[in-house]
């Protein structure tokens, strides 16, 4: 398989392809400014505060009145609160949510005047005014086309904003939902005895049909169905001089080589909570779940390990001198099939790139094994990993990852039956043990 690329898919469907395009903010609070838009107190928006403010604008895109959940704290924040929090962490100086809101409004009015002053004819001015009238203050100063006019901002945050732009979706956090349980009960098939005069017992009830065969003990405890099971999944980087897989660094890793029958059942998450994290158009999570089967849908929360050594790996991408970036996966089945595996990388709920691979079965020890090994990671993902790693704080990385997802769909190539659908969401690991994960079943009550 060749290097990943954007454009029309290869004949065998093996390459990465680009795909579809990708209000608390600015409201409330006193203005805190004079009639000319200048601050009412000297130093309120000093250069260091303004620098941090601009960085925060790039990190936290407009999200209306939605709240963002910071998983390491478990608290919900509006965008202006996050910006104020960022300023405090970066500069040690306190700015309130209302001060942030007022500053956004001041900049929005200033930006509106600048744009209109540069337009010469009245028609263009009217059109620009109508467009800006539909935008909130936060949208006006955060729109990518206007970002360059806002003055200096941190190179790391600005690069990432331009690289990872898109409309914001609602917040999402995996709830700790326990599976529904119900006390056992029994039904007696023997009619009650009665000594009442004239009582005639009803005819004997027909015996119940034999129960359906039980699914494998692991099935409710691992990522898989009776038809197809995920055995292993990993995304990794290998240094240029690697001689075996032990030298690779694992960003994420799932191993289900020996699922334990005694493990607790998977917790459940309502699939509707994450619809907007994935494309709404054909092939999106909602449409796939509507088609089913529902027992084939899973959610995996990864805590990714981004500590992959010194700058030797930072020197290049998958095609350069910085090592090999790849993805490997392995499945097992009792059926002989040809699998098609589609992996869609999504930003703000929009598909960015897709890779489609096909794999035939190998018979091993009475079971059919499917291995998709060392599939090259697309350049988009490699660049994203490097830019993400440049952010100085973990919570900044998690804020970016809040809007990064992957949807992986495995089907039977010949019948087009959906066998497994897995939604992946991400945070940054702080564990000394490296990458961690948790698997959930996706349900819809």
Swiss-Prot record:
Q: In which compartments does the protein localize?
A: Nucleus
What InterPro entries does the record tag this protein with?
Answer: TEA/ATTS_dom, TEA/ATTS_sf, TEC1_TEAD_TF, TEF_metazoa, YBD
Q: Determine the domain of life of the protein's source.
A: Eukaryota
Region annotated Transcriptional activation sits at 172-445
- Quick one: where is this thing mainly located? nucleus
Task: Name any Gene Ontology BP term.
Answer: paraxial mesoderm development
The record's keywords, sorted A to Z, are: Activator, DNA-binding, Nucleus, Transcription, Transcription regulation
Q: From which source organism is this entry?
A: Mus musculus
The UniProt gene name for this protein comes to Tead2
Which intervals carry biased composition (Pro residues)?
199-216
Comp. bias regions, Gly residues: 25-37
Q: Which PROSITE patterns does this UniProt record tie to the protein? A: TEA_1 (PS00554), TEA_2 (PS51088)
Q: Which GO terms describe its molecular function?
A: disordered domain specific binding; DNA binding; DNA-binding transcription factor activity, RNA polymerase II-specific; RNA polymerase II cis-regulatory region sequence-specific DNA binding; transcription coactivator binding
Q: What is the lineage of its organism?
A: Eukaryota, Metazoa, Chordata, Craniata, Vertebrata
Annotated region (Disordered) at 1-47, 191-217
Q: Know the name of this protein?
A: Transcriptional enhancer factor TEF-4
Q: SMART domains given for it?
A: TEA
**In which tissues or organs does this protein occur?**
Highest expression in brain. High levels also found in lung, testis and ovarian follicle cells. Lower levels in heart and spleen.
């Amino acid at each position: 398989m060749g290097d990943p690329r954007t454009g029309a898919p290869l004949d065998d469907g093996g390459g990465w392809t680009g795909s579809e395009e990708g209000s608390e903010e600015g409201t409330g609070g006193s203005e805190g400014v004079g009639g000319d838009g200048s601050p009412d107190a000297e130093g309120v928006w000093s250069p260091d505060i303004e620098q941090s403010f601009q960085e925060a604008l790039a990190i936290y895109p407009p999200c209306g009145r939605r709240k963002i959940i910071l998983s390491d704290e478990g608290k919900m924040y509006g965008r202006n609160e996050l910006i104020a929090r960022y300023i405090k962490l970066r500069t040690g100086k306190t700015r309130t949510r209302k001060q942030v809101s007022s500053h956004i409004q001041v900049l929005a009015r200033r930006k509106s005047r600048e744009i209109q002053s540069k337009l010469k004819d009245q028609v263009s001015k009217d059109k620009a005014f109508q467009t800006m009238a539909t935008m909130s203050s936060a949208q006006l100063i955060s729109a990518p086309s206007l970002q360059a006019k806002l003055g200096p901002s941190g190179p790391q945050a600005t690069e990432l904003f331009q690289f990872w732009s898109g409309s914001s979706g609602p917040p999402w956090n995996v709830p700790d939902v326990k599976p529904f349980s119900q006390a056992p009960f029994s039904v007696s098939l023997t009619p009650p005895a009665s000594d009442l005069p004239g009582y005639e017992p009803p005819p004997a009830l027909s015996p119940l049909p034999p129960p359906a065969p039980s699914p494998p003990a692991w099935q409710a405890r691992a990522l898989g169905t009776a038809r197809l099971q995920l055995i292993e999944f990993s995304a990794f980087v290998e240094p240029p001089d690697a001689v075996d897989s032990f030298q690779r660094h694992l960003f994420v890793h799932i191993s289900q080589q020996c699922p334990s029958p005694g493990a607790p059942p998977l917790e459940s998450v309502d699939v509707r909570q994450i619809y907007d994290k994935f494309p709404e158009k054909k092939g999106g999570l909602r449409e796939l779940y509507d088609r089913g089967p529902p027992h084939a849908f899973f959610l995996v929360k990864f805590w990714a390990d981004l500590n992959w050594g010194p700058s030797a790996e930072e020197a290049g991408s998958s095609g350069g001198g910085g090592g090999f970036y790849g993805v490997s996966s392995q499945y097992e089945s009792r059926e002989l099939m040809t699998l098609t595996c589609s992996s869609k990388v999504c930003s703000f709920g929009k598909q960015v790139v897709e890779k489609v691979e096909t794999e035939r079965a190998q018979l091993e020890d009475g079971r059919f094994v499917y291995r998709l090994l060392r599939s090259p990671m697309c350049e988009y993902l490699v660049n994203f990993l490097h830019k993400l790693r440049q952010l100085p704080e973990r919570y900044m990385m998690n804020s970016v990852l809040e809007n990064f997802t992957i949807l992986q769909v495995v089907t039977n190539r010949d019948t087009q039956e959906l066998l497994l659908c897995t939604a992946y969401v991400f945070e940054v690991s702080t564990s000394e043990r490296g990458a961690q994960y948790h698997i959930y079943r996706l349900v819809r009550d």
